[in-house]
Curated annotation (Swiss-Prot):
Domain RRM, chain residue ranges per copy: 136-214, 230-308
This protein's name: 31 kDa ribonucleoprotein, chloroplastic
Function: Could be involved in splicing and/or processing of chloroplast RNA's.
GO biological process: chloroplast rRNA processing; mRNA processing
Organism: Nicotiana sylvestris
GO molecular function per UniProt: mRNA binding
PANTHER family in alphabetical order: 31 KDA RIBONUCLEOPROTEIN, CHLOROPLASTIC, OS02G0815200 PROTEIN
Amino acid sequence: MSCATKPIIKPSSMATNSCLISLPPLFATTTKSKSFAYPYLSNTLKPIKLLHLSCTYSPCILSPKKKTSVSALQEEENTLILDGQGQESGDLFNFEPSGEETEEEGFVEAVGDAGESDEVEADEEEEEFQEPPEDAKLFVGNLPYDVDSEGLARLFEQAGVVEIAEVIYNRDTDQSRGFGFVTMSTVEEAEKAVEMYNRYDVNGRLLTVNKAARRGERPERPPRTFEQSYRIYVGNIPWGIDDARLEQLFSEHGKVVSARVVYDRETGRSRGFGFVTMASEAEMSDAIANLDGQSLDGRTIRVNVAEDRSRRNTF
């Protein structure tokens, strides 16, 4: 038995927005030897007209998972609400600070308190340390070249409390320039130091101590008295002769008030001449008459009356 089937209704194509519907084919059976009758296929079938079906679509709305209260609040804070014109709605941004102090405000306040405490401590330190007055600073000249800042401080400690002691050195040679500065704690101690150490003998050299000049002022120089008739110039003296040896040499001819060998400030070496002041004119004349042209350690010295500086500057 053979069976042939044909679809009664052909599927038809619809429009783009229409649905495609196809009906199941109905089978018609033909037999050669035997025929089978089906009650529901006994009648002839008529074609079925299809109605034009329209199909519309709408976006699907998926409901998200249930959010926790914390995540919902975070999303709400980070969401911008736009009005119909595309402008940002400011309702979410208009908020008033709560009465509780924020972390940032607390940090700023803590920093402010720390700054105030630092200022108070700095003020207390300034009150404890007071800079010595300018009038307590002294100039010390004609220092021996082997005296350093520490030795200068120890020397002036006998007059009071030494705040600062400094010997000035040459930058190139790193040798003492023969002078320095000492700052005492009070003006009274500075005045006492001037009385004690001005014309004070240190290693054969007489110190010059007076008040140092203030900032912007010229150094104060004490008035000098030149005893022209008693002051002697001594030239061509040997390099190894110091103040003490020069004084000893002239003391054989009278009372020596002062004896000084002139040294180079840069190198600290003797310049080969000096000055001697005798107590009287007679003693000065006797020393010149006996010592001029004499040999001293292999060198012939020159001895004569020292020239007055005031008269020398007039030429």
